Amino acid sequence: MADLSGVYDQTRRRISDFVGSLSEADQDRPVPAAPGWTVHDVVANLTGDLAAIQTDDFPGSFFAAVGEPDEVAKLNAWTARMVEERRDRPVRDVLTEWEQLTPAVMAMLRGEQPLPSGLPPFVDRVLVTDVAVHEQDIYGALGLVRERDCSALRIGTSTYVAGIWLRLGELAPPRFETDEETYQAGQGEPGATARTGRFELFRALSGRRSPEQIRAWEWSADPEPYLHLFYVYGPRTEALVEP
């Protein structure tokens, strides 16, 4: 199994080096994948995640009801607060805070220190998935194609698919066929098989593709019953096209 703390920190370093090298104008560039946010805000969110773990302020209830409107609203308010708290600080200061918070949280993920009681046991995968999502948000905002086959993205894809399994209810599991790997969200005969690229699958599972974009994949059956499963952070109506 991948060392998830190592994968997280490797991705953090990559983002920090990249964002730290940007001009102030590019650090303030809007991020289409995260409407209303800039590159600065994305870094603030990632930093706030670790601060919240250390202070036991992580919204554990969200993971018990993923995608439910009330929980999505709570999560969005929590995220907005952590971003707002860092909005007036220079990016370099936020990156420094992120770096300083990382060792203690990584020790928790490795089992060397106790995690706060409200966190789910798979919080390590949640953090790796989140950092992979936001790394691509940043690259997409700048029109760049980078790190689309990295460990964090692969782990994030399998984590999102596992999350669909937990939310299927009475639906037969969907199967996703990509050139790199096949994923199935549950056991038994699939109710529908979709074929697309792994990067597209990852971005869709993180809510970065519109329903129309997902419908346009090659489906073996009607995709409609499955579309809501792609939006754990709330619906997306506008298409997001990335290079």
Named regions from a protein language model:
Residues 1-3, 51-110:
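Short, helix-capping/interhelical loops that line the mouth of catalytic, cofactor-
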Residues 1-20:
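Non-cleavable N-terminal signal-anchor transmembrane helices
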Residues 10, 34-45, 126-133, 196:
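Aromatic- and histidine-enriched alpha-helix N-cap/loop-to-helix transition segments
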Residues 16, 43, 54, 95, ...:
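Non-transmembrane alpha-helical segments in soluble domains
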Residues 16-38, 59, 107-119:
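Helix-loop segments that flank and shape redox-cofactor active sites
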